[in-house]
Amino acid sequence: MASRPGFLTDWPWTPLGSFKYLLLAPLVFDSIYSYATIRDHEKLLIVAVTVWRIVHSQIWISLSRYQTAKGTKRILNKSIEFDQVDRERTWDDQIIFNTLIVYLTKVYVSGTSTIPFWRTDGVILVALLHAGPVEFIYYWFHRALHHHFLYSRYHSHHHSSIVTEPITSVVHPFAEHIGYTLILGLPLITTFMCGTVSVVSIALYLTYIDFMNNMGHCNFELIPKFLFSLLPPLKFLCYTPSFHSLHHTQFRTNYSLFMPMYDYIYGTTDECSDSLYETSLEKEEEKPDAIHLTHLTSLDSIYHLRLGFASLSSHPLSSRCYLFLMKPFALILSFILRSFSFQTFVVERNRFRDLTLHSHLLPKFSSHYMSHQQKECINKMIEAAILEADKKGVKVMSLGLLNQGEELNGYGEMYVRRHPKLKIRIVDGGSLAAEVVLHSIPVGTKEVLFRGQITKVARAIVFSLCQNAIKVMVLRKEEHSMLAEFLDDKCKENLIWLVGDGLSTKEQKMAKDGTLFLPFSQFPPKTLRKDCFYHTTPAMIIPHSAQNIDSCENWLGRRVMSAWRVGGIVHALEGWKEHECGLDDNSIINPPRVWEAALRNGFQPLLLPSLET
């Protein structure tokens, strides 16, 4: 939001929220009906171009987030936080706006029913009009927007983002977009009035605008130096991402739209433009201090990745109705990942004190870890990731979710045994996860019910509870026939349930009203009881000093990390030299020691949930 919002700041459909796409429903139905009855394909092309523009922008979002996390040719190292993601979630409003304008023009303006598919003279005229009047008018309009009156009421909203993402380019107040539409629409309006407009010229011009906007705000340099050496005038006809990045950091330079020649003509070119361009091109891939290795969970988790939909990744993973309609696309994306991704890759970069923290994704779903045919492939990918990180000098790698399964690799011990000379420390985070669960149990608890798969974390929890004279009641399938009558009665009276994978619906129904379910597993139980309390999986709130946090870790809330991930970070912060993986006694670092180190470094436990009144 601008510092002093002016008239027409909000979009007309802002109150609709995510339902704003319903505005396009009549257009879609009408285009299908028109094609079915009178073979009018032009309305269908409007829908196709709209979809293409959304997909095109999403490709840029994913590419930019991957490249900036990797670090190669990154321009600015500053962080992006949740407030920027929330502010820029309206990036698609301008596509809806443009679509409605084109559709209404098609329906109500005479002469639009016979637009040819291609006209060479029209394409050339559009290019000339853009290079001349459009770039010139935009330059002075942009400078006017930086006058205090307009800047404080409108343009400051756009400049709230110092570090830009591709979608930053189109995040403006509604009034600004009206001005941009009038300016950028000049070539199309002129060619229409001259009778030289064509379907291709419209689609190409819109794609060109989107491409240049996204490229200019992607925060990594991608235009090679040899192009400017081969074609020196190109420097004045095509800006670079670093050129426009200076406009967001210096504010009073580099005003041009896509062609810097007007900045050179009127003396507003930033003197650092060339040097920033060269230094950005020379930046190499960043070496992290710690890596957290995770994987995909459900099919919809593709969209919740940081490289996926920014508006979804900034919120906890949950099922959404409209994602059901996108199942076919998710299946296609999952097929692409399985077919072309043979190694892990970076999806997120964070900073905490002097540490650079990366999250890497192993492109497999949770279901793949249940398949014996996939285990060898998964182990090879994890092993390759560890060896590659060790070669680069990474200090710690923590194994998240099912990457540390007991049956898969013995909580990571298999890799240490195969490669005893590893310099990188392998951490499963079990010590901290156990301590998080133990400190979530309300003070004064005398007994708890244990139900779930027996894991390393479960063993550590039960051992500690027994040491503290807390009674642990066990409910397992193999014990059911012998203890059914006794346990059924007792379970209804126990208000603290420690639960892991394998908790059934029937067993949840046995719990008494007000029961607190405390998961010790990587995955949360299904929330079936509204009269019970469900705590999150072992996790901690990260310190405010942690930077570049703009996405959520699976089902966890904002600025919350799983205990297994935090365990790896603490391991790196403390500089511990031992591995924390495997099942023997030496594989668990003294849990209280890890807990105290986490608190000392600013990590905080989550509050217990409460029932809604």
UniProtKB/Swiss-Prot annotation:
Membrane topology according to the record: Multi-pass membrane protein
GO molecular function, one term: iron ion binding
GO biological process: lipid biosynthetic process
Tissue: Not detected in any tissues.
Ubl conjugation recorded as keyword: no
GO cellular component, one term: membrane
Transmembrane regions listed in the UniProt entry: 13-33, 44-64, 95-115, 122-142, 182-202, 322-342
Keywords for the protein's UniProt record, in alphabetical order: Membrane, Transmembrane, Transmembrane helix
Coiled coil (UniProt feature): none
Highest taxon listed in the record's lineage: Eukaryota
Domain Fatty acid hydroxylase per the UniProt entry, residue ranges: 134-268
Name of the protein in question: Protein CER1-like 2
Chief localization: membrane
Keyword Electron transport: no
Similarity-based family: Belongs to the sterol desaturase family.
